[in-house]
């Protein structure tokens, strides 16, 4: 969503209006445990289509992250995953990992906003206006 607000063409993979993936496209996936079946399958399909794949994970040694062109390791406790470097949490399941994702992607958007010289006002103009 925020990539679109920055003026980039972006789509959510599960939306029926998402176009086909091709060489030159970037597919970004999050897979905390690195072994979520449907995410691993979609990453495999993106690779077959020629897309560049980036996976954000808490378990970089698992199958899905190993298939990626780029892997970003978030050292936080994940649901059904293990990594000796993960920060433990008293929170249930993958909450810590998910919270880190929100912060990580927010920081990435702010960095892109600065690099692309896009203002908050420009981004707001691209926000839907029918809610």
Predicted regions: what they are:
Residues 1-103, 109-110:
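Glycine-rich phosphate-binding loops that contact phosphosugars or nucleotide phosphates
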């Amino acid at each position: 969503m925020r990539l679109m607000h920055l003026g980039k063409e972006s789509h959510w993979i599960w939306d029926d209006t998402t176009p086909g993936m091709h060489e030159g496209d970037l597919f970004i996936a999050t897979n905390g445990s690195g072994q979520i079946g449907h995410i691993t399958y979609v990453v495999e399909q993106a690779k077959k289509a020629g897309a560049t794949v980036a996976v954000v994970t808490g378990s970089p040694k698992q199958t899905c992250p190993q298939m990626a062109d780029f892997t970003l390791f978030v050292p936080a406790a994940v649901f059904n995953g293990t990594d000796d470097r993960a920060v433990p949490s008293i929170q249930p399941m993958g909450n810590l990992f998910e919270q880190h994702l929100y912060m990580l992607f927010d920081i990435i958007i702010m960095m892109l906003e600065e690099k692309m010289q896009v203002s908050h006002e420009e981004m707001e103009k691209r926000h839907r206006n029918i809610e």
